[in-house]
Amino acid sequence: MSVISIVPLASKSCLYKSLMSSTHELKALCRPIATLGMCRRGKSVMASMSTSLTTAVSDDGVQRRIGHHHSNLWDDNFIQSLSSPYGASSYAESAKKLIGEVKEIFNSLSMAAGGLMSPVDDLLQHLSMVDNVERLGIDRHFQTEIKVSLDYVYSYWSEKGIGSGRDIVCTDLNTTALGFRILRLHGYTVFPDVFEHFKDQMGRIACSANHTERQISSILNLFRASLIAFPGEKVMEEAEIFSATYLKEALQTIPVSSLSQEIQYVLQYRWHSNLPRLEARTYIDILQENTKNQMLDVNTKKVLELAKLEFNIFHSLQQNELKSVSRWWKESGFPDLNFIRHRHVEFYTLVSGIDMEPKHSTFRLSFVKMCHLITVLDDMYDTFGTIDELRLFTAAVKRWDPSTTQCLPEYMKGVYTVLYETVNEMAQEAQKSQGRDTLNYVRQALEAYIGAYHKEAEWISSGYLPTFDEYFENGKVSSGHRIATLQPIFMLDIPFPHHVLQEIDFPSNFNDFACSILRLRCDTRCYQADRARGEEASCISCYMKDHPGSTQEDALNHINNMIEETIKKLNWELMKPDNNVPISSKKPAFDISRGLHHFYNYRDGYTVSSNETKNLVIKTVLEPVPM
């Protein structure tokens, strides 16, 4: 068995008289603990280990578990060498001009009531324009225009839906489905009963057997609408099953085209795992292909031109922010801890994929730092740390006092120092945007997270397999969703007073559902690898324990059903009528849930980031779009 090379440091350690109360004093009880050095601000103590084995033994006989994680894929020198011309002011001026021209297009649509737009398709034109700017990631420039368009469309909404134009008596599925989705996402009250009017006598959505482009587009919009269902909406469940089946069959019969690419994307990345920037990049490519085939109207071409320019201007900002992230990671000393996953670039890709507002740099950087700290703690509690070391660290976090770290092994001292300094620095920055001290909120979330991980470490140490309910309640906290969300949103220029936090933070339903989705989805993707590392407890194994004779397939089916139902509950928490907490205040936390879900869409793209996640980094961060 491989041996960890240890440079002798402190040979004594301390245990706390009580691990449960932050007011108890440290009591020095001499006990040997293996130490591992960490590079921090020029002080380097290196350690080497084999990652090809599940465990390794230190020089003084301490057995440690290892995670089999691949190394960092993105060299700091490479990151620092990135450059883009799109940060020049001339590009910003061009974008400003195009924004004005697109506003004029919106304004021309808003004159429809005066008879300047065709009464047979004006509603569809309004909706298509809104849909285009949102999917292309440029809607932040047109919030006023979007509201005017949607108010106009909603004024013609009926219990049977709408037709393509204000003078069209017969409703149609395409316009109704597109309108339903966009209106619901913007907080308008619409009910799924409208889709009952598109069923035949057999209770099925009426459509021909032919896969015409018009019909496919209608069913595609129906599928997109079905993904924002609320609990108990049976017609939405039926619509999702029908439309997904129809679209999969259509892919087998239609030629490869921009339409087939759009179908593939929507089926692959459903609403709750969709990254807006990836969608923008994909939709740019689709519209660009339509441009080559002369299939775009003048207005859409103008919108596409702006979208490409905006994508590349933000790409320039991404490179600068990524350089800052990489410098922080390098200076933290974390590169010298080779038992952890180094995924700072991947986390930046995720957060810049859900928030493309240039002024939200501190939000994005805070998210990356917090997620990387969570990853370090995850790997320390899950694998490398001994149970005695973890007890010490858990108590030290509860005390939140650097002077109490003298009893920690050296590698933990380094981790604690970076954690303490980074969280405090971010809290000071958050005070500028929130106008009050937010540190206590974050500390409470961090203590809960550490406590949940400590409980899981105790389970691993003792070989205990909990019940599903016991594991799940703890696992929602150890998912890290709450702590990954709370600190970053405080950096936004959105006020989060106490009544808003009550709606989105613990113990709200919103927080519970978001944490549940992440824990359940993570376990379905990670349970086999976790078991190989000696982590027996998962939603799958605990379900099988509670249901003797059940199979892994039974457990996965049950958990996938739980995920689908919980997504509907989270949809409701986001979009339910609530005058006190608008959608805009809940959307950042919701989008973080979507982003984290994206990592686990088909596999653990967080731990194994060398496949789809690597391609995501290239497509949405490293490469500009061709102009």
Curated annotation (Swiss-Prot):
Localization per record: Plastid, Chloroplast
Chief place of localization: plastid
Any one Gene Ontology molecular-function term assigned to this protein's record: magnesium ion binding
Binding site for Mg(2+) 3: 530
EC id: 4.2.3.107
List of residues binding Mg(2+) 2: 378, 382
Chloroplast in keyword set: yes
EC class name: lyase
Cofactor, free-text remark: Binds 3 Mg(2+) or Mn(2+) ions per subunit.
Residues binding Mg(2+) 1, per UniProt: 378, 382
Induction: By jasmonic acid (MeJA).
Transit peptide: 1-36
Cellular component GO terms held in the UniProt record: chloroplast
BP terms from Gene Ontology: diterpenoid biosynthetic process; monoterpene biosynthetic process
Pathway: Terpene metabolism; oleoresin biosynthesis
Function of the molecule: Terpene synthase (TPS) involved in defensive oleoresin formation in conifers in response to insect attack or other injury.
Family the entry assigns: Belongs to the terpene synthase family. Tpsd subfamily.
Further comment found in the protein's record: Expressed only in susceptible trees.
Record-given protein name: Carene synthase 3, chloroplastic
Lineage: Eukaryota, Viridiplantae, Streptophyta, Embryophyta, Tracheophyta
